[in-house]
Amino acid sequence: MDLPGPIHEILVLFGGFVLLLGGLGVVLLTNPIYSAFSLGLVLVCISLFYFLLNSYFVAVAQLLIYVGAINVLIIFAVMFVNGSEWSKDKNYWTIGDGFTLLLCITIPFSLMTTIPDTSWYGILWTTRSNQIVEQGLINNVQQIGIHLATDFYLPFELISLILLVSLIGAITMARQ
């Protein structure tokens, strides 16, 4: 979006603050329905960041796929779980929880140090020069594919990882 500097900064700070609160709600709330709604809030805030970064296609895909489908599916699945199962477990911290916390702290820091130093266009198969030459020769669907493979490669891969984690979580819940 082409917003003035202060408004853009306020929206980024607001989105980040709401994103942090929603993430804490997903992890800390004991009621799984409230956690699922917090996850929906997190996904909407991520979509807001994509709008602010002028990647409207990824933002709309985030809203439609993750907020509209995945989060509704999670809420639907959680509503079938017996509510008494969640209130009986009073063992709050285990060794696995500590390992998971350590992993959840180290992965974002390693990503924050790795991603800015990586030249993403050197990794990708298509380059900017090929994209400019082919723009007049291809249709809109192929242009979307080229944009997903060049400009929006990292957000597209991160969204696919989020989908993978949600599918693993759904399978784990279904087995229990």
Curated annotation (Swiss-Prot):
It catalyses: a plastoquinone + NADH + (n+1) H(+)(in) = a plastoquinol + NAD(+) + n H(+)(out); a plastoquinone + NADPH + (n+1) H(+)(in) = a plastoquinol + NADP(+) + n H(+)(out). Pfam families: Oxidored_q3 (PF00499). The chain crosses the membrane at residues 10-30, 33-53, 60-80, 95-115, 152-172. Belongs to the complex I subunit 6 family. InterPro entries: NAD(P)H-Q_Oxidoreduct_6, NADH_UbQ/plastoQ_OxRdtase_su6, Nuo/plastoQ_OxRdtase_6_NuoJ. It comes from the Eukaryota. It is a multi-pass membrane protein. It is found in: Plastid, Chloroplast thylakoid membrane. NDH is composed of at least 16 different subunits, 5 of which are encoded in the nucleus. Its main location: plastid. It comes from Sorghum bicolor. Keywords: Chloroplast, Membrane, NAD, NADP, Plastid, Plastoquinone, Quinone, Thylakoid, Translocase, Transmembrane, Transmembrane helix, Transport. Its EC number is 7.1.1.-. The lineage of its organism: Eukaryota, Viridiplantae, Streptophyta, Embryophyta, Tracheophyta. NDH shuttles electrons from NAD(P)H:plastoquinone, via FMN and iron-sulfur (Fe-S) centers, to quinones in the photosynthetic chain and possibly in a chloroplast respiratory chain. The immediate electron acceptor for the enzyme in this species is believed to be plastoquinone. Couples the redox reaction to proton translocation, and thus conserves the redox energy in a proton gradient. This is NAD(P)H-quinone oxidoreductase subunit 6, chloroplastic. It is an enzyme of class 7 (translocase). GO terms for molecular function: NADH dehydrogenase (ubiquinone) activity; quinone binding. GO terms for cellular component: chloroplast thylakoid membrane.
